[in-house]
Amino acid sequence: MKPDAHQVKQFLLNLQDTICQQLTAVDGAEFVEDSWQREAGGGGRSRVLRNGGVFEQAGVNFSHVHGEAMPASATAHRPELAGRSFEAMGVSLVVHPHNPYVPTSHANVRFFIAEKPGAEPVWWFGGGFDLTPFYGFEEDAIHWHRTARDLCQPFGEDVYPRYKKWCDDYFYLKHRNEQRGIGGLFFDDLNTPDFDHCFAFMQAVGKGYTDAYLPIVERRKAMAYGERERNFQLYRRGRYVEFNLVWDRGTLFGLQTGGRTESILMSMPPLVRWEYDYQPKDGSPEAALSEFIKVRDWV
């Protein structure tokens, strides 16, 4: 079946609505919407919830941009895209909770299509979701990965292990020699066996994110915490910033295509701290995190 960009766009707009409604139901606060246009073509809807009952900041962004040529970040690993016009659309979100016992989460689903006259379109889907805890709870990690595994199951037994490994490899801070969190799913360049199959998988990932995340939020949001936990949360958020600005392909793509900087950097935590040569106390819950986020099979 020929790729149907309009159908994908409708799904993404509905997904943004649904996720915002689900997060509002947990938090109580409303999202503020900011619609924007891109001079070179396209636009989007950025929605942000700030200082809610549960979430310090949650950003859920829809964007649909198009242009005459792909940026360097996209053609570097796909040279056949050079000289093609492109459309890129997606929903991307990051949730930064107040409570350090509630993990930060990120999800993204996207679709690219690149065309030139007289040639077949080049298209693919990408996306995934990943979890960044500050304090590790095994039952949360197992639930997160079990949800990821179960949504992958109808698409093949090898899908979850493949995309889990890709996630572990992708969300890795080389300069720190550590994982960003406990991973989840990551996929890109998905265009086989056909459009319908790939689109169905992307939809399953988009819908599966809140199934994976919200039960963890409900379980942890009322846990008591103090200044020590908050300081550690802010320190660990620094890793999030480092990854997004140094390693993340999506951030680079957005900035190189003249995307809307406010929306691209919406993933940044509102507060963060760095501390020179920070070492948590041996045997402390803070020290346990470095072991907890090491790659392992959770299910």
Swiss-Prot record:
MF term (GO), any: protein homodimerization activity
Residues noted as binding a divalent metal cation in the record, renumbered to the chain: 96, 106, 145, 175
GO CC annotation: cytoplasm
Alphabetical keyword list: Cytoplasm, Heme biosynthesis, Metal-binding, Oxidoreductase, Porphyrin biosynthesis
Cofactors demanded by this protein: a divalent metal cation
Biological-process GO terms, alphabetical: protoporphyrinogen IX biosynthetic process
Membrane spanning residue stretches: none
Pathway participation: Porphyrin-containing compound metabolism; protoporphyrin-IX biosynthesis; protoporphyrinogen-IX from coproporphyrinogen-III (O2 route): step 1/1
Catalytic residues in the record: 106
Subcellular location: Cytoplasm
Main location: cytoplasm
InterPro entries referenced in this protein's UniProt entry, alphabetically: Coprogen_oxidase_aer, Coprogen_oxidase_aer_sf, Coprogen_oxidase_CS
Enzyme class, broadest EC rank: oxidoreductase
Catalyses which reaction(s): coproporphyrinogen III + O2 + 2 H(+) = protoporphyrinogen IX + 2 CO2 + 2 H2O
EC number: 1.3.3.3
Cited Gene3D superfamilies: Coproporphyrinogen III oxidase, aerobic (3.40.1500.10)
Family (UniProt): Belongs to the aerobic coproporphyrinogen-III oxidase family.
Record note on quaternary structure: Homodimer.
Main function: Involved in the heme biosynthesis. Catalyzes the aerobic oxidative decarboxylation of propionate groups of rings A and B of coproporphyrinogen-III to yield the vinyl groups in protoporphyrinogen-IX.
Entries under PANTHER family matching the protein: COPROPORPHYRINOGEN III OXIDASE, MITOCHONDRIAL, OXYGEN-DEPENDENT COPROPORPHYRINOGEN-III OXIDASE, MITOCHONDRIAL
Protein name according to UniProt: Oxygen-dependent coproporphyrinogen-III oxidase
Species of the source: Shigella flexneri serotype 5b (strain 8401)
Gene name, Swiss-Prot/TrEMBL: hemF
